[in-house]
Amino acid sequence: MKLSQIKALLKTVDRVSFKLPNGELVPAHFHVTEVGKITKNFIDCGGTIRNEALVGFQLWTANDTEHSLKPQKLIDIIELSEEKLQIEDHEVEVEYQGTTIGKYGIGFDGTHFLLLNKQTDCLAKDNCGIPIEKQKVQLVDISSSGNTCTPGGGCC
């Protein structure tokens, strides 16, 4: 989800809440301790130079259980970051401390912002010898698709 989408959604909710991939909610007294620009410049295993840009949020939970981040306060933090750091409208990545620091994509279910698991992937499969996964088709599906040859149909 892009930063502009998060800002628009924040204007529609009464409270900010995040749900972990396992369904648990991040404690309501969380803090957003960072909003920043993340850049990653690297060479993939195929030798291609790549540049990525993300917006990073860091969530942190302290023992101040009376704290509650209001949607407008988060919008204010985001807008200050956009102004001072020249943050553009990139995808947002959220860091949250579990057993280690987890990095998540973000979604929204109408009530909660969803922390979505991220996956690693090879960016140069064509250069690494990784076979391209072929689409599996069952024979029964082929014959029922209507793309069969008939005598006089001109397909042969």
Model-derived regions, located:
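Residues at beta-strand starts and edge strands
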Residues: 14, 53-55, 90, 111
